[in-house]
Amino acid sequence: MAATLATMMCLSSFSMMNVWADKKEDSEPLVINYISARGETDAALKTLKKLAEDYKKDHPDFEFNVESIADRETYLQKIKILASSNELPDWFDADPEAFFEGLCKKDLIYSVDDLYDELGIKDKFFDIALNYPKLSGGSNYLMTWQGNVEYFWYHKDMFEKAGITETPQTLEDLLDVCKKLKDAGMTPISAGNYDMIMRYPAFKAFRLEGNDFIDNARMGKEKFNSETGIATAQYTQDIAQYFSEGWTSSDTTAQMDLFLNNGAAMLYTGTWDTPDLVDDEGNLKDDISMFKLPVDSEGTATGENDYYANCGIGTAILKDSMSDEMKDFISYVWDNFADTAMYEFNMLPSMMPSDPEKLPELTQQIL
């Protein structure tokens, strides 16, 4: 009896080993094809590539293939063509807008809400990283890599040369500062013809009505010939005269270069650009400082501590591409992303780094 039992146990063990071996043999190497709207120098993309290289050390068959298309119009056109021919990549970047929502409704995209629950990591993210990418129905299908706050960045020396002793407190003050800079022979604002330029028309509306005006206008419930719409148009016209020359043909890189080379006194952008604005220790370069979006002297809907924050463009995962191997890689990414992004690439990530006390002074100020 004992011999029979031992034989059965050996056979059972051998059978289990064979099943496990078969599963390992059936498991295909993980290959992720990722089309990104981020530029090659983007800190989030650099972080992902670094983590993919590290992951590959223990998973030699793993491949992380990235195609970067920084021009947003070209990028969107390609994604729409791929979607129409049912050839979307494993990963691709998207915003929570109508086209992407349509893909989600067709059940093509894996739920990030479900993914974070499955990995047990949802509570590690900043609230904005979970709320900003939500679709109109409240669900989330996008991984977000950044925790961004938007500021006006300025050269202290240029302000001083123009006789400006304090940063503008109101939108009207901002126009006065621009005039002083221009009268002193300087270019007030470095601007570029890409999505951030649309912040300027939104400033006045945001201060007068919060997000309601833009949200309602987007849904056709508000018109731009209303009192707020007219005030918004007038302010945009007033401030546009202080944009850098040739801004309509300038992109984000040229806009940053102009500012860094003292070609303009101010730049409005988010903390995703801090790698260009800080020194090796992660602190702002000596001549650069920042101020929040000024309030409006007449509007009371939003105050000085209400300003634009976002988590950047998100990344979607094709539902048919999801696998246990994919989840293992994503789990590895999120276990290491925050520290790698913050301490190696000076980027504020979408979740808190492991040791907040080590954060640069600028980052602590933002948080």
Give, region by region, the residue ranges found by the protein language model.
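Conserved N-terminal structural module of periplasmic/extracytoplasmic solute-binding proteins
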Residues: A2-A6, L11-E101, K105-K106, L119-D123, ...
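Alpha-to-beta junction loops
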Residues: L82-A94, L108-Y110, G185-P188, N261-G270
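Extracytoplasmic/periplasmic solute-binding protein
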Residues: S136-W145, E150, L175-K221, A264
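Glycine-centered hinge/linker elements that transmit conformational signals in sensory
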Residues: C178-L181, R218-S249
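Short, solvent-exposed loop/beta-turn-alpha elements that line the ligand-binding surface or hinge
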Residues: S111-F125, E209-A231, D279-N283, K292-D306, ...
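Long, aromatic- and glycine/proline-rich binding clefts that accommodate carbohydrate-like moieties
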Residues: F291-V295, M342-L367
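Hinge/lid segment of periplasmic solute-binding proteins
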Residues: D95-Y151, L175, Y200-A202, T228, ...
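Extracytoplasmic/periplasmic substrate-recognition and gating elements
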Residues: L30, E53, K57-D58, E63, ...
